[in-house]
Regions:
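PAS-family sensory domains
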Residues: 2-69, 122-123
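A short beta-strand signature within small-molecule sensing/ligand-binding domains used
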Residues: 88-95
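PAS/PAS-like sensory domains
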Residues: 71-80, 90
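Sensory coupling linkers of modular signal transduction proteins
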Residues: 98-123
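Short acidic-hydrophobic surface loop/beta-edge motif
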Residues: 79-85, 97
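Hydrophobic beta-strand positions
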Residues: 24, 96-97
Length: 123
Protein backbone atom coordinates (compact mmCIF):
# COMPACT_ATOMS: atom_id res chain seq x y z
CA UNK A 1 0.00 0.00 0.00
CA UNK A 2 1.21 3.48 -0.77
CA UNK A 3 0.87 4.82 2.78
CA UNK A 4 2.60 1.94 4.52
CA UNK A 5 1.83 -1.68 5.13
CA UNK A 6 -0.30 -3.84 7.39
CA UNK A 7 -1.56 -7.38 7.41
CA UNK A 8 -5.05 -8.31 6.25
CA UNK A 9 -5.89 -9.13 9.90
CA UNK A 10 -4.75 -5.65 11.00
CA UNK A 11 -6.74 -3.97 8.22
CA UNK A 12 -9.86 -5.96 9.07
CA UNK A 13 -9.52 -5.18 12.80
CA UNK A 14 -9.02 -1.49 12.04
CA UNK A 15 -12.13 -1.36 9.82
CA UNK A 16 -14.15 -3.15 12.50
CA UNK A 17 -12.95 -0.68 15.15
CA UNK A 18 -14.25 2.42 13.37
CA UNK A 19 -17.71 3.53 14.63
CA UNK A 20 -19.16 3.43 11.11
CA UNK A 21 -20.71 0.87 8.81
CA UNK A 22 -18.66 0.26 5.66
CA UNK A 23 -19.84 -1.58 2.55
CA UNK A 24 -17.79 -1.97 -0.63
CA UNK A 25 -19.49 -2.62 -3.98
CA UNK A 26 -17.24 -3.47 -6.92
CA UNK A 27 -17.36 -2.02 -10.44
CA UNK A 28 -19.88 -4.72 -11.46
CA UNK A 29 -22.31 -3.63 -8.71
CA UNK A 30 -21.57 -6.70 -6.57
CA UNK A 31 -21.37 -6.50 -2.77
CA UNK A 32 -17.83 -7.56 -1.87
CA UNK A 33 -17.26 -6.45 1.72
CA UNK A 34 -18.87 -5.05 4.81
CA UNK A 35 -17.27 -4.51 8.18
CA UNK A 36 -18.51 -6.31 11.26
CA UNK A 37 -20.30 -4.89 14.27
CA UNK A 38 -23.67 -3.41 15.12
CA UNK A 39 -25.58 -2.21 12.07
CA UNK A 40 -28.38 0.25 11.47
CA UNK A 41 -28.98 -1.36 8.08
CA UNK A 42 -28.96 -5.15 8.19
CA UNK A 43 -26.31 -6.78 6.00
CA UNK A 44 -26.68 -10.55 6.02
CA UNK A 45 -23.68 -12.61 4.99
CA UNK A 46 -25.67 -13.92 2.04
CA UNK A 47 -25.53 -10.39 0.51
CA UNK A 48 -21.84 -10.87 -0.27
CA UNK A 49 -21.28 -11.68 -3.96
CA UNK A 50 -24.81 -10.55 -4.82
CA UNK A 51 -25.87 -7.50 -6.81
CA UNK A 52 -26.21 -4.43 -4.60
CA UNK A 53 -29.62 -3.50 -6.00
CA UNK A 54 -31.19 -6.68 -4.63
CA UNK A 55 -30.31 -5.52 -1.09
CA UNK A 56 -32.26 -2.26 -1.16
CA UNK A 57 -35.99 -1.61 -0.83
CA UNK A 58 -37.68 -0.97 -4.21
CA UNK A 59 -38.26 2.73 -3.45
CA UNK A 60 -34.52 3.26 -2.71
CA UNK A 61 -33.16 1.20 -5.62
CA UNK A 62 -33.50 3.95 -8.29
CA UNK A 63 -31.51 6.35 -6.10
CA UNK A 64 -28.75 3.77 -5.58
CA UNK A 65 -28.62 3.05 -9.32
CA UNK A 66 -28.41 6.77 -10.08
CA UNK A 67 -25.60 7.33 -7.58
CA UNK A 68 -23.51 4.44 -8.88
CA UNK A 69 -24.09 5.49 -12.50
CA UNK A 70 -22.95 9.04 -11.67
CA UNK A 71 -19.75 7.60 -10.19
CA UNK A 72 -19.14 5.45 -13.26
CA UNK A 73 -19.59 8.37 -15.65
CA UNK A 74 -17.51 10.69 -13.43
CA UNK A 75 -20.24 13.27 -12.80
CA UNK A 76 -19.95 12.86 -9.02
CA UNK A 77 -17.40 11.56 -6.54
CA UNK A 78 -19.53 11.45 -3.40
CA UNK A 79 -23.16 11.73 -2.36
CA UNK A 80 -24.25 12.49 1.22
CA UNK A 81 -27.73 11.37 2.32
CA UNK A 82 -29.03 12.54 5.69
CA UNK A 83 -31.81 10.54 7.31
CA UNK A 84 -33.43 9.74 10.59
CA UNK A 85 -33.83 6.14 11.70
CA UNK A 86 -34.90 4.84 15.08
CA UNK A 87 -35.18 8.48 16.21
CA UNK A 88 -31.50 9.20 15.52
CA UNK A 89 -29.81 11.24 12.78
CA UNK A 90 -27.62 9.30 10.35
CA UNK A 91 -25.34 10.34 7.54
CA UNK A 92 -25.03 7.82 4.72
CA UNK A 93 -22.27 8.84 2.31
CA UNK A 94 -21.51 7.08 -0.94
CA UNK A 95 -18.00 7.53 -2.37
CA UNK A 96 -16.63 6.60 -5.77
CA UNK A 97 -13.52 4.45 -5.38
CA UNK A 98 -10.99 5.17 -8.12
CA UNK A 99 -7.45 4.08 -8.88
CA UNK A 100 -4.53 6.45 -9.50
CA UNK A 101 -5.55 6.74 -13.16
CA UNK A 102 -9.09 7.77 -12.12
CA UNK A 103 -10.62 4.47 -13.26
CA UNK A 104 -13.77 3.53 -11.36
CA UNK A 105 -13.19 0.51 -9.10
CA UNK A 106 -16.38 0.56 -7.09
CA UNK A 107 -18.43 2.35 -4.49
CA UNK A 108 -18.03 2.52 -0.74
CA UNK A 109 -21.07 3.24 1.42
CA UNK A 110 -20.39 4.68 4.88
CA UNK A 111 -23.13 4.91 7.50
CA UNK A 112 -22.44 7.10 10.51
CA UNK A 113 -24.65 7.67 13.56
CA UNK A 114 -24.61 11.45 14.00
CA UNK A 115 -26.30 11.54 17.42
CA UNK A 116 -22.92 12.28 19.04
CA UNK A 117 -22.58 15.45 16.93
CA UNK A 118 -26.15 16.55 17.59
CA UNK A 119 -25.48 16.42 21.33
CA UNK A 120 -22.64 18.95 20.92
CA UNK A 121 -25.05 21.51 19.45
CA UNK A 122 -27.95 21.23 21.89
CA UNK A 123 -28.11 23.47 24.90
Amino acid sequence: MGGGHMSAAQLEAMLNTLPIEITFIDDNNINRFFNEGAKVFKRPGMAIDREVFSCHPPKIEPMVRSIIESFKNHTRDSVPVWMEKQGKPFLVTYYAVRDKKDNYLGTVEVVQDMQFAKEHFTS
